[in-house]
């Protein structure tokens, strides 16, 4: 890479998040749109990406032919579905393109594929690209180190009716941050559903609760509750542009990085706090 401007390709460019990403690229210094990809056979192929996103003609048309634009971008941003992301991951690895992955819902095999690809290309893989959420991840880590041994820990998340995975990737990232702080295996300490006669709450568990309703962009709360007091650390997003700007920031940050797996806390230099 190391061009004057990073050329960014956006997958799912015709979707809600894709259009926000196009707008974020247009607004960003040090980046420009290189390609805008849509699903195979889309009726929008040939449409100007900027006009679709509401930011004026950019001279970049929507395409479903990844091979045709292979030389037009340095970094690919993908916020789609796991199966599609893994297809683009294989292409980027083969063609030595960096990647920003905001897709959630990967199984262990999908995560392993991302880790393997990072041996050859630079990848930022994060459940959430909001600056605020990544600050929250650091805060819940700190709270867990102080209160985790004795407090009841619950994570509550809410999203719009169209979200297809639960709990959200961000909720799971919060759980992982807490588990890592406690030297726990999240799989052994997580409780994802309660129904019927559950008995008393088990100590040293992390409960997850999920809401799907309306047009909620994203809300997350980590609760550390003891007898007589509780601490709640919350984040509420009101616009997808928050995530889009963070993803573009991550793409620009990747300039000059040849390989490795990073997260948004790397981009924001939060790991050392």
From Swiss-Prot:
GO terms for biological process: diaminopimelate biosynthetic process; lysine biosynthetic process via diaminopimelate. The keyword Zinc does not apply. GO terms for cellular component: cytosol. Pathway: Amino-acid biosynthesis; L-lysine biosynthesis via DAP pathway; (S)-tetrahydrodipicolinate from L-aspartate: step 4/4. It catalyses: (S)-2,3,4,5-tetrahydrodipicolinate + NAD(+) + H2O = (2S,4S)-4-hydroxy-2,3,4,5-tetrahydrodipicolinate + NADH + H(+); (S)-2,3,4,5-tetrahydrodipicolinate + NADP(+) + H2O = (2S,4S)-4-hydroxy-2,3,4,5-tetrahydrodipicolinate + NADPH + H(+). (S)-2,3,4,5-tetrahydrodipicolinate binds at residues 160, 169-170. Pfam families: DapB_C, DapB_N. Keywords: Amino-acid biosynthesis, Cytoplasm, Diaminopimelate biosynthesis, Lysine biosynthesis, NAD, NADP, Oxidoreductase. Its main location: cytoplasm. GO terms for molecular function: 4-hydroxy-tetrahydrodipicolinate reductase; NAD binding; NADP binding; oxidoreductase activity, acting on CH or CH2 groups, NAD or NADP as acceptor. The active site is at residues 159, 163. InterPro entries: DapB_C, DapB_N, DapB_N_CS, DHDPR_bac, NAD(P)-bd_dom_sf. NAD(+) binds at residues 12-17, 102-104, 126-129. Homotetramer. Catalyzes the conversion of 4-hydroxy-tetrahydrodipicolinate (HTPA) to tetrahydrodipicolinate. HAMAP family: DapB. PANTHER family: 4-HYDROXY-TETRAHYDRODIPICOLINATE REDUCTASE 1, CHLOROPLASTIC-RELATED, DIHYDRODIPICOLINATE REDUCTASE. This is 4-hydroxy-tetrahydrodipicolinate reductase. It comes from Erwinia tasmaniensis (strain DSM 17950 / CFBP 7177 / CIP 109463 / NCPPB 4357 / Et1/99).
